[in-house]
């Protein structure tokens, strides 16, 4: 038998999708699986936070997502990673469980029935909605996006628990997202600049400034991350709040070589992620 690995999702392929499927919101916290009385990350390393271990280590075989704060908050990845990947502290963390890994050959619906919520202790079973057609899936996705989540997870009701990544053809575990996200290594930094060039008005009445470098003034904080993408690089300069821009720039040496999680839309004409936006720093123990 292959060694245990968490089951991971692949992007869904509409042409391969077979109904009915079970659908739920895509959670974007920190993956957690309880094995041998230890809460483990996706990489099967212990979650560092003592409070997390104290609260959830008794939930043997539960597989789910740790969430700090609200599960549909736009900053949930950052707040969750910050809370559960440090040893000390008692973050406002909940465990949203969606699978049970004791018997990997058992059907998903049977494994799901083994899960139990414990609202008093912040343990919640993720509801699964049966979807019977592409029309129903599109309606469910619209509702999920309107509530603030960023995608949908799909499961075959008869799926086993696969050790590793499910394929689109298998359909055991799939994700429906209109954008992509991935982790990229930080290989450089660009400083944010203030454009002191004289403002002029275009023929359309819009204000514009020259991009002449001589009149650009360094602002002493991050303008963009330079990220590795295969044999090339690309820049990501959006998605940061003010504190992150200042902190990352001040501690560039510490962040160099770490991985940034980036949201992006397909690929541009230069074959690099298009319109990238920063989601957070991804702890290597959760990769």
Task: Label the predicted regions.
Residues 14-124:
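Covalent nucleotidyltransferase
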Residues 2-46, 103, 123-272, 276-285:
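Nucleic-acid 5′ end/cap handling module spanning
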């Amino acid at each position: 038998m292959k060694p245990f690995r968490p089951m991971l999702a692949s992007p869904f392929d509409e042409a391969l999708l077979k109904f009915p499927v079970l659908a739920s919101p895509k959670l974007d916290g920190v993956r957690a699986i309880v094995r041998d009385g230890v809460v483990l990350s996706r990489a099967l390393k212990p979650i560092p936070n003592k409070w997390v271990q104290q609260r959830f280590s008794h939930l043997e075989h539960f597989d789910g997502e740790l969430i700090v704060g609200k599960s549909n908050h736009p900053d949930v990845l950052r707040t969750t990673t910050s809370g559960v990947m440090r040893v000390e502290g008692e973050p406002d963390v909940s465990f949203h469980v969606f699978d049970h890994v004791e018997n990997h050959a058992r059907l998903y619906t049977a494994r799901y029935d083994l899960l139990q919520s414990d609202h008093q202790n912040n343990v919640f079973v993720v509801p699964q909605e049966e979807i019977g057609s592409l029309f129903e899936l599109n309606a469910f996705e619209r509702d999920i996006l309107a509530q603030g989540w960023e995608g949908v997870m799909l499961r075959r009701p008869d799926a086993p628990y696969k050790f590793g990544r499910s394929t689109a053809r298998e359909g055991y575990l799939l994700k429906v997202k209109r954008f992509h996200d991935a982790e990229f290594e930080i290989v450089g930094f660009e400083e944010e600049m203030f454009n002191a060039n004289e403002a002029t008005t275009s023929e359309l009445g819009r204000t514009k400034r020259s991009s002449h470098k001589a009149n650009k003034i360094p602002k002493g904080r991050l303008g963009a991350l330079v990220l590795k993408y295969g044999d090339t690089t690309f820049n990501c300069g959006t998605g940061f709040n003010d504190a992150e821009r200042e902190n990352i720039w001040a501690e560039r040496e510490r962040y160099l070589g770490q991985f940034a999680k980036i949201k992006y839309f397909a690929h541009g004409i230069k074959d690099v992620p298009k319109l990238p936006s920063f989601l957070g720093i991804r702890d290597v123990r959760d990769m």
